[in-house]
């Protein structure tokens, strides 16, 4: 049986870490639209924020990514979709949304040295870029699809990760996820 899990959330909320933990626990592959977009930004010689701004006037790039998510959602295999809009393009997925305090998000991202094309001089600069990027994405999704990505009704489960360890977030997700997938704990 193919299952889809749509993991979305705010920048710095821990989506990538959670996706990795879920992939290991459930033996599922991850498709990360954020990674695809970061690669495209690098290809175009832009920061992620610059690329998001660029996509505001070049919706064909968003559509390209969105079409990929839709196609992955139709594949006959189980997948974890790490994407802000997978909940919209894969309606049968378990839709999980992670929240985080903006200051904590900035601290997490500033301290993440794996983000090679997202380097900042300070937590404050990181915070400014995150705010601009969040606004850019919300605007694009509202203009292109008429949706509010912050509307809690879009999701099966919301978790505020601000004061939780990655393990605690994983544990909060597993019970409702297993119930949704029709699995019993311990299977």
For each feature predicted by the language model, list its residue ranges.
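Post-Walker A helix-loop "phosphate-sensing" segment adjacent to the P-loop in P-loop NTPases
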Residues: 24-31
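Small-molecule kinase domains that catalyze NTP-dependent phosphoryl transfer to phosphate-bearing small molecules
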Residues: 118-169
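ATP-dependent small-molecule kinase phosphotransfer cores
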Residues: 31-90, 103-107, 111-118, 124, ...
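C-terminal accessory "lid"/substrate-recognition subdomains
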Residues: 140, 158, 168-187
């Amino acid at each position: 049986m193919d299952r889809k899990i749509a993991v979305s959330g705010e920048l710095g909320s821990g989506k990538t870490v959670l996706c990795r933990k879920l992939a290991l626990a459930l033996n599922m592959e991850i498709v990360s639209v954020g990674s695809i977009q970061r690669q495209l930004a690098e290809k175009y010689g832009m920061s992620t924020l610059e690329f998001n701004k660029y996509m505001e006037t070049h919706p064909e790039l968003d559509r390209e990514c969105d079409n990929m998510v839709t196609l992955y959602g139709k594949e006959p295999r189980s997948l974890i979709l790490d994407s802000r809009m997978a909940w919209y393009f894969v309606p049968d997925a378990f839709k999980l949304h992670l929240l985080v305090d903006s200051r904590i998000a900035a601290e997490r991202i500033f301290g993440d040295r794996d983000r090679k094309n997202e380097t900042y001089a300070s937590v404050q600069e990181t915070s400014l870029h995150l705010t601009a990027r969040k606004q850019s994405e919300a605007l694009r999704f509202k203009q292109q699809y008429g949706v509010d990505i912050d509307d809690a009704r879009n999701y099966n489960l919301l978790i505020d990760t601000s004061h939780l360890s990655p393990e605690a977030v994983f544990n909060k997700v597993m019970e409702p996820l297993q119930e949704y997938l029709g699995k019993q704990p311990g299977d």
